[in-house]
Amino acid sequence: MVDRKAVIKNADMSDDMQQDAIDCATQALEKYNIEKDIAAYIKKEFDKKYNPTWHCIVGRNFGSYVTHETKHFIYFYLGQVAILLFKSG
């Protein structure tokens, strides 16, 4: 297991949900190597736990500008990997 430091860059989300996002992303990074698979895992877990429709972007270099539901957005790093998770729709 690799110890990845979580650094939250921006969040509009409850503290409990933020911790869930970090925990879920940590699990995804342990299970998968491909960014698309990591994003799919996080998205599906949040759809199950917090109802659809969640969107997840995982990568090392991307820009974004998204519309999200209030209290359903987080952008954070786990080690060198950035994760954007938000609910819309």
From Swiss-Prot:
Q: Which Pfam families match?
A: Dynein_light
Q: Give a brief account of the tissues where this protein occurs.
A: Broadly expressed in tissues including the intestine, body wall muscles, germs cells, oocytes, the rectal valve and cells in the head.
The family database entries (PROSITE patterns) matched by this protein are listed as: DYNEIN_LIGHT_1
Extract the GO molecular function terms from the UniProt entry.
Answer: dynein intermediate chain binding
Q: Which GO terms describe its cellular component?
A: cytoplasm; cytoplasmic dynein complex; microtubule; microtubule associated complex; nuclear envelope
**Without the gene, what phenotype results?**
RNAi-mediated knockdown results in viable animals, with progeny that have nuclear migration defects in the hyp7 hypodermal precursor cells at the L1 stage of larval development. RNAi-mediated knockdown results in increased germ cell apoptosis, but does not affect somatic cell death. RNAi-mediated knockdown results in reduced mett-10 accumulation in nuclei. RNAi-mediated knockdown prevents fbf-2 localization to P-granules.
Summary of the function given for this chain in its UniProt record: Acts as a non-catalytic accessory component of a dynein complex. Part of a complex with bicd-1 and egal-1, which is recruited to the nuclear envelope by unc-83, where in turn, it recruits dynein to the nuclear surface and regulates nuclear migrations in hypodermal precursor cells. Probably within a dynein motor complex, plays a role in the cell fate specification of the germline and oogenesis. In particular, it inhibits germ cell proliferation. Regulates the function and localization of the RNA-binding protein fbf-2 in the germline. Plays a role in mitotic and meiotic processes.
* Residues of the site described as Required for mett-10 binding: 62, 67, 73
Quaternary structure, per UniProt, is: Interacts with mett-10; the interaction is direct, and is required for the nuclear localization of mett-10. Component of a dynein-regulating complex composed of at least bicd-1, dlc-1 and egal-1. Interacts with egal-1 and unc-83. Interacts with fbf-2.
Q: Does the keyword Cell cycle apply?
A: yes
Subcellular locations according to the entry = Cytoplasm, Cytoskeleton; Nucleus envelope; Cytoplasmic granule
Describe the effect of residue 68 to A. Does not affect mett-10 binding
Gene3D superfamilies per UniProt: Protein Inhibitor Of Neuronal Nitric Oxide Synthase
Q: Which UniProt keywords apply?
A: Apoptosis, Cell cycle, Cell division, Cytoplasm, Cytoskeleton, Dynein, Meiosis, Microtubule, Mitosis, Motor protein, Nucleus, Transport
Q: What is this protein called?
A: Dynein light chain 1, cytoplasmic
Q: Does the keyword Acetylation apply?
A: no
Similarity comment: Belongs to the dynein light chain family.
Organism, as annotated: Caenorhabditis elegans
**GO annotation (BP), single:** cell division
